[in-house]
Amino acid sequence: IRIATELMKKWHITLPDPDLSYLPEGTPEFDEYIHYMTWAQRFAMLNREEMMERFLTELKYSVREFKEVERINSHHNFTQRENHFNQNIWVTRKGAVKADIMDRGMIPGSMGTRSYIISGLGNKMSFNSSPHGAGRKMSRTKAQKQFTMADLEKAMEGIEYRKSEVLIDEIPGAYKDVDLVIEQSRELIKVDYVLRQILNCKGD
């Protein structure tokens, strides 16, 4: 943000708030940022692929027969070049996923609620985007103060998970209602499958 603020002064660009400062396209600073950003996004994708491969390898030890039907790569908090309204622009999706026509995605709930496999409807007014999940309705600190282990055990009844106070801030009650999120996204996506939690893996 410091470099962007300096560029605003250099280019005599006036903004209502310094936090809105940006890197003008065509500058060396912009090109460098895009280079490292795309590298990081590629790195993240390869990490997801590696995690999936390891998960499937471990699954073979406990489930004798299974068939991988489809692999969905749905990332959020990313930027890419797209064409919207006959203009090539950079679209940043923060807390959102790409939901162009028939784009496959996943909208997860919390560690104890349902998740949804979806297909995009290509809503132009949303720049072909949809929510990426339920999202928090309270901070981790507030959740730790408000909920107890008894609350967590009740919310996670019927789901296998690691019982630890460390996970209290991930309790379903700290998140928005994912079913309501799906309902409010009906112009952006269509639901293909509804997934029910049976096992939760969460690190410290």
Which functions belong to the PLM regions below?
Residues 1-204:
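Domain-length cofactor-binding catalytic modules of enzymes
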